[in-house]
């Protein structure tokens, strides 16, 4: 296995740029992930092109050598450059980004849609929840945190490739596309909403729950595009994040 000793190595610099720039990730169709558990987990739904690992990491996890792609040993100071956080596990992978579109949405499916959810941790947690509940896909509007940014990947714990993620641009147009397939779209908002428990239990055409940004909630255009609005009643006033709300109901 070839060993990289310089922080200025071209492959290392390329990987670092993937981690730091969303525009570069989109242009290249690739992303960088790190972690002894996360990298193998991502291999379940994304193609691993390049694996970087330190000697100590390989000694602890020899099964890493069985992963696909090109493998490189890196010295600790090189791993420090690749790392997004100060304490790392010495394992990094460059993956091809899975691409999914609205054409894959199917009648009868269950979907989650996020509009302008900006915190990477929140996006990652919602992806993980969608995967855990067996959702068929997640739609992300413009303004959402990048799914394949390092912080989002850590929060999603591999869910970013276990559930199809579709970047849809403007949410009202995406909702129109779903409703054209007989999918009921429910906006999570306070204004003129009904409790989630009172919503009709069966949606034979499928259902999509639409959640808005942490601070502003859903846009009026998105709420108007949906089939209805719902809320989750709370027994006391607690701060939750993300907490979708419509400004008119504040």
For each feature predicted by the language model, list its residue ranges.
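Short, structured coil segments at secondary-structure junctions
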Residues: 67, 156, 161, 225-226
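Short beta->alpha connector loops at strand-helix junctions that form conserved
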Residues: 74-75, 115, 141-142, 164, ...
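Conserved small/polar residues in nucleotide/adenosyl-binding loops
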Residues: 239-244
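Glycine/small-residue-rich loop that forms an oxyanion/phosphate-binding "nest" at active or ligand-binding sites
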Residues: 74-86
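Boundary-proximal intrinsically disordered activation/regulatory segments immediately upstream
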Residues: 1-55
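Active-site/ligand-binding-proximal alpha/beta "capping" segment
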Residues: 188-237
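RNA substrate-binding interface of SAM-dependent RNA methyltransferases
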Residues: 99, 104-192
């Amino acid at each position: 296995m070839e060993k990289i000793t310089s922080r200025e190595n071209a492959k290392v610099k390329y990987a670092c740029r993937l981690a730091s720039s969303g525009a570069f990730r989109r242009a290249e169709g690739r992303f960088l992930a790190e972690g002894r558990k996360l990298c193998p987990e991502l291999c379940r739904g994304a193609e691993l092109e390049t694996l970087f690992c330190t000697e100590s990491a390989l000694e602890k996890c020899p099964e890493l050598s069985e992963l696909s792609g090109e493998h490189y040993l890196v010295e600790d100071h090189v791993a420090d450059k690749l790392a997004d956080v100060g304490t790392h596990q010495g394992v990094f992978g460059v993956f091809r980004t899975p691409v999914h579109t609205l054409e894959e949405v199917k009648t009868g499916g269950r979907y989650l849609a996020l509009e302008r959810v900006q915190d990477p941790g929140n996006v990652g947690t919602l992806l993980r929840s969608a995967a855990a509940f067996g959702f068929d896909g997640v739609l992300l509007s413009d303004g959402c945190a990048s799914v394949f940014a390092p912080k989002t990947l850590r929060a999603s714990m591999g869910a970013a490739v276990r559930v199809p993620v579709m970047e849809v641009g403007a949410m009202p147009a995406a909702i129109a596309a779903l409703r054209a397939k007989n999918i009921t779209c429910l906006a999570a908002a306070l204004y003129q909403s009904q409790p989630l428990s009172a919503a009709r239990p069966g949606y034979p055409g499928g259902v999509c729950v639409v959640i808005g940004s942490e601070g502003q909630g859903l846009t009026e255009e998105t709420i108007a595009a949906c089939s209805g609005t719902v809320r989750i009643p709370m027994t006391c006033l607690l701060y939750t994040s993300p907490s979708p709300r419509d400004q008119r109901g504040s």
